[in-house]
A protein has these predicted regions:
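Generic structural motif
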Residues: 10-12, 23, 42-47
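Short, mixed-charge low-complexity intrinsically disordered segments
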Residues: 32-84
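Short aromatic-glycine-(Arg/Gly/Cys) micro-motifs in beta-strand/loop hairpins
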Residues: 1-16, 25, 35
């Protein structure tokens, strides 16, 4: 499975400020620019909700955990995250 690394700065923006194919490139860019924020590893070509289920990190227990609102807002502590 392929992954990308997404950086979201510590400011008030809701959107990421950079996307990288390699963690080393992300860390270098963050260091060079003295940034603070979170770098998270995301799988490519699979919804996060489905990824968590396929990897046994999450099992929906009822319809509320399977509806559109749950899927579009899904997040997991199992995503690899680095703080800067």
């Amino acid at each position: 499975m392929d992954y990308i690394w997404i950086f979201k700065g510590s400011g008030k923006t809701e959107f990421p400020s950079a996307v990288f194919s390699k963690k080393s490139n992300a860390i270098k860019w963050i260091a060079e620019n003295e940034l603070t924020g979170v770098l998270t590893k995301y799988p490519i070509d699979i919804p996060l909700f489905e990824w968590a289920i396929e990897n046994d990190y999450f099992t929906p227990k009822n319809e509320l955990q399977r509806n559109a609102k749950a899927i579009e807002n899904f997040n997991s502590a199992y995503f690899r995250t680095l703080s800067f």
